[in-house]
């Protein structure tokens, strides 16, 4: 009897539809999302498209930071209007590399407010919308997207671990073992994205922790291109990311 029950559960699991099956998904991001970077390799969104039969609207552009995300979102809005089911944001590694200050989420001031019929002094906080800081940029983007797409699912992906990369004599990017020009390590940016998830009620998939990718390790060379690029995953690295995203998305509705 137990064996029969197990078989039934297995069949149900295999035939149950993934909540993101056949959906229209927009991807905003940087070079790891950009179809023009490593064009001969399948990207994570391409694997998700194969696994879920999704329609992909890809707007990622190499080198972009959080301050550029609204340009991509506005282009999505112009080209597709509201005809999109979900938006995925994969951004942050270039903010770290460029030395963007982390900044603050809020400003705080004391105001007089009516509480239970009495005018009392209370502290009040307001979001910082400052495009010169990382948290200010995230606040600006998520505030705008929540207003632009109030009924749509929005999901953030954290940056993955970074290895050394050299693309030219003047474009040399140290590995994540080094802090950036403002003294921050990459995990400060990863943690800020995770904090933003709670602040803005936007789900986050922590690829930094869950993907298993450590491009600085020689033993994981199968996940990165040959040469001096230990920053961008190759097709196998993207496949691993896609599998992680696929299973995390099982717990999230794509539409409401």
Region spans (language model):
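Positively charged n-region of N-terminal signal peptides that target proteins for export
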Residues: 1-4, 152
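Bacterial Sec-dependent signal peptides at the C-terminal "C-region" and cleavage site
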Residues: 3-23
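Residues that line or immediately flank small-molecule/substrate-binding pockets and catalytic motifs
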Residues: 8, 29, 91
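Alpha-helical transmembrane segments and their juxtamembrane interfaces
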Residues: 12-13, 40, 163, 244
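Residue-level detection of beta-strand scaffold positions
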Residues: 16-19, 25, 59, 142, ...
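Serine-esterase "nucleophile elbow" of acetyl-processing enzymes
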Residues: 18-62, 67, 72-83, 87, ...
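Alpha-helical cap/lid subdomain in secreted, periplasmic
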Residues: 51, 73-256
């Amino acid at each position: 009897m137990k064996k029969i029950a197990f078989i039934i559960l297995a069949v149900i699991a295999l035939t149950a539809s993934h909540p993101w099956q056949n959906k229209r998904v927009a991807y905003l991001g940087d070079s790891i999302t950009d179809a023009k970077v490593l064009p001969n390799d399948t990207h994570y969104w391409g694997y998700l498209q194969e696994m879920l039969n999704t329609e992909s609207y890809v707007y990622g552009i190499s080198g972009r930071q959080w301050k550029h995300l609204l340009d991509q979102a506005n282009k999505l809005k112009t080209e597709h209007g509201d005809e999109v089911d979900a938006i995925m944001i994969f951004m942050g590694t270039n903010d770290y590399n460029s030395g963007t200050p982390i900044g603050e989420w809020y400003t705080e001031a004391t105001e007089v407010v009516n509480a239970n019929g009495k005018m009392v002094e209370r502290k009040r906080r307001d979001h910082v919308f400052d495009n010169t800081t990382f948290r200010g940029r995230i606040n600006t983007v998520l505030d705008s997207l929540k207003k632009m797409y109030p009924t749509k699912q929005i999901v953030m992906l954290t940056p993955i671990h970074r290895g050394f990369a050299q693309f030219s004599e003047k474009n040399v990017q140290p590995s994540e073992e080094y802090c950036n020009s403002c003294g921050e390590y990459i995990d400060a940016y990863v943690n800020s994205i995770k904090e933003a998830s709670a602040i803005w009620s936007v789900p986050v998939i922590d690829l930094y922790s869950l993907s298993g990718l450590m491009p600085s390790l020689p033993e994981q060379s199968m996940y990165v291109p040959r040469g001096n690029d230990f920053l961008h995953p190759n097709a196998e690295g993207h496949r691993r990311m896609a599998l992680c995203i696929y299973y995390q998305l099982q717990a999230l509705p794509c539409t409401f």
